[in-house]
Amino acid sequence: MLHGRGAGAKTIFSVEGLLDPGYHVLAITGLYNSAIDGKEWFKPREEIPGEITDAKQFDESERVLTENVEAHISRVRADRSKIFLWGFSQGAAMALILGLRGKVKPRGVVAMSGFLPTPVKIWKKFDTNTQYLLPHGSEDEVLSAESSKSAKSFLESKGIEAEYYEYKGRHKMSLESIAYVNNWILRLSEI
């Protein structure tokens, strides 16, 4: 699970108790200090959601996340068909990147209250085998639900299966949204 901007791995573990007890959760903290406290995966351009200001930070976060996820999969001998990436906000952007690049090859990606980073839109190749769930709060005051709807449209335009789910709430994980994600993961795990 990948946290949002201004948070850290500890915030993710507060959600772990609400998930299916069979899950093994790996949470990684962003590499960079955030201007709003906590950590972040890359420096965003405040005025343009999805834009990044430092491509090196973005690339380094992708590299470190890929290495950590791969090492963890090897260490616990995980079945790749049961690997899911789940990110919130800026962490959702990174989860989308890892899924689309195809290096990690997860079964599914949950990009909650997130956005598709601009660099992705110029890529030529995508891994189309991963399924995506894009939950977003209807009253999100940080990122409009349009950012997830736009990501869904982009994914589908590349032949990638994506589902948008809107829940009542602001820029946070609600009990309703966590339950929906939990059921989605369980459903895909059985296929």
Walk through the language-model features, giving the residues of each:
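Conserved alpha/beta-hydrolase "nucleophile elbow" surrounding the catalytic nucleophile
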Residues: 3-5, 86-88, 137
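Short beta-strand/loop motif that positions the catalytic acidic residue
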Residues: 133-136, 140
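Gly/Ala-rich beta-loop-alpha elbow adjacent to hydrolase catalytic centers
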Residues: 87-91, 95
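C-terminal catalytic histidine-bearing segment of alpha/beta-hydrolase fold enzymes
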Residues: 131-133, 146-191
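Serine-hydrolase catalytic machinery in alpha/beta-hydrolase-like enzymes
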Residues: 1-78, 82
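Flexible "cap/lid" loop of the alpha/beta hydrolase fold
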Residues: 37-45, 114-132
